[in-house]
């Protein structure tokens, strides 16, 4: 240990009872339960572009989710190619087409169970299959004596009501709960792991692969290894001041995390005051490629344009928000960043996309992105069309006509019947995730009757 290094007094750090709950192989589990099958023992994959009525025809898309048994039997992971499966397909392999709306409905059902244990302020949805709960103040109400007992109770409730298995990490703070889930829970027979401050030397410091820790990507791991830091123990016993000097606020945060310290609290999400129409996506993985992020932003702009036109509205403000991966902080110590600009009233998808991509160029600087939000605000509702004085009148009218044609086709044949070619690129979400409901995975929120803002 370095002389005069920063030390932490756990007695002065936040100590709550935080649960990080993950629905095990969520999409695949939902499909198994819908078929009356066991989610753990059934070999099942969710595959895009697979014709279930086509017998042994080979799928050509992505494997979006795999059951635990399928992963083990075929040595595959989530988000692999159809060609990675043995062909002809084994008789005991179940292949399901993705049904995002079904998954979102099941997600909402499960989150209602969570909310029966905690209030809104103590419930945070991290992704479609993962949530944080602060159950510190819920023990007496549910007549339990520990966070572990509470976790067992919630786990049983979710399974009894939905048939979905959950894994749970318990910690004094969100970070410890998250790493307990990611690393500890999957090794336990009851799929629950509890990591407390006093357990750090025997749990957190035993992690050999830095990239297993949320907030440390491969690029950061390489930088740390260049500094002689090869595992979490090395990180905890390195110089705080050297880390801070070389990596800025991120270095300070990594040092704190290596000691299991996280001073963040669960809270309610930010909502804009002005009436707005927007979309918010929790991405299926960390995005670090600007081009991939741009594809998603453009898709979301297209969705918002459609929703504005359906509502008979025009926006005077376009805003973009980028949320970072769990545990990631930028050089300013922030967990996310957002920016908005005023625009001439519009509901044209092309204009909204151009503004959104401009905002992306201002905001993105190699951060690790897990959440994207795009919104339109200060809406005006009237029949008159306001043209931009600095652009060709003919071009603007032509773009409006194009939007009307696109809307007509999508209304009849579905949103993904007509999408940008860029949606076929890596990172695209509009096709494989064709129903953006509740802020995750798709592209139809507000277009087929929903109004998620």
What are the residue ranges of the model-derived segments?
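Core structural elements
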Residues: 128-131, 314-329, 375-384
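Residues that scaffold, gate, or flank divalent-cation-dependent active/transport sites
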Residues: 1-128, 132
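Acidic, metal-coordinating catalytic segment for phosphate/diphosphate chemistry
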Residues: 30, 334-453
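DNA-contacting surface of Y-family translesion DNA polymerases
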Residues: 8-13, 20, 212, 222-366
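Short, conserved phosphate-binding/catalytic loop or strand-edge motifs used
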Residues: 128-135, 172-177
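Catalytic palm subdomain of template-directed nucleic-acid polymerases
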Residues: 133-155, 225-228
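Long, highly charged, low-complexity intrinsically disordered interaction regions
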Residues: 150-209
């Amino acid at each position: 240990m370095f002389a005069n290094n920063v030390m932490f007094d756990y007695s002065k750090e936040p100590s709550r009872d935080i649960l990080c709950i993950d629905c095990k192989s969520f999409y695949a589990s939902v499909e198994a339960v819908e078929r009356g099958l066991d989610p753990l023992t059934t070999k099942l994959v969710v595959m895009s572009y697979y014709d279930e009525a086509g017998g042994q025809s080979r799928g050509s898309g992505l494997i979006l989710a795999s059951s635990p048994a399928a992963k083990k039997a075929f040595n595959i992971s989530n988000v692999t190619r159809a060609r990675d499966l043995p062909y002809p397909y084994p008789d005991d392999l179940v292949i399901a087409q993705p049904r995002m709306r079904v998954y979102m409905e099941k997600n909402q059902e499960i989150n209602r169970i969570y909310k029966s244990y905690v209030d809104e302020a103590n419930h945070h949805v991290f992704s479609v299959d993962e949530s944080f709960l602060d159950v510190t103040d819920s023990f007496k109400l549910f007549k339990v004596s520990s966070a572990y007992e509470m976790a067992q109770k919630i786990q049983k409730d979710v399974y009894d009501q939905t048939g979905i298995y959950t894994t749970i990490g318990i910690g004094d703070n969100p970070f410890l709960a998250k790493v307990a889930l990611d690393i500890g829970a999957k090794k336990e027979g009851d799929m629950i792991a509890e990591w407390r401050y006093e357990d750090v030397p025997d749990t957190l410091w035993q992690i050999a692969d830095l990239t297993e820790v949320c907030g440390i990507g491969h690029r950061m791991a390489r930088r740390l290894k260049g500094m002689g830091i090869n595992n979490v123990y090395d990180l905890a016993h390195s110089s705080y001041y050297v880390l801070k000097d070389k990596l800025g606020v991120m270095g300070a945060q990594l040092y704190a995390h290596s000691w299991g310290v996280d001073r963040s609290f669960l809270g309610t999400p930010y909502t804009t005051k002005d009436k707005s129409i927007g979309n918010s996506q929790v991405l299926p993985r960390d995005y670090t490629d600007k081009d991939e992020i741009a594809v998603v932003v453009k898709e979301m702009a297209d969705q918002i344009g459609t929703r504005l036109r359906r509502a008979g509205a025009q926006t005077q403000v376009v805003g973009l928000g980028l949320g970072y991966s769990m545990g990631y902080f930028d050089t300013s110590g922030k967990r996310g960043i957002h920016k908005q600009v005023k625009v001439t009233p519009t509901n044209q998808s092309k204009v909204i996309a151009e503004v959104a991509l401009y905002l992306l160029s201002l905001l993105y600087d190699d951060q690790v992105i897990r959440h994207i939000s795009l919104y339109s605000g200060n809406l005006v509702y009237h029949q008159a069309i306001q043209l931009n004085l600095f652009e060709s009148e003919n071009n603007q009218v032509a773009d409006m006509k194009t939007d009307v044609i696109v809307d007509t086709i999508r209304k009849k044949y579905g949103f993904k019947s007509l999408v940008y070619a860029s949606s076929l690129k890596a990172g695209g979400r509009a096709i494989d995730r064709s129903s953006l409901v509740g802020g995750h995975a798709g592209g139809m929120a507000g277009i087929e009757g929903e109004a998620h803002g």
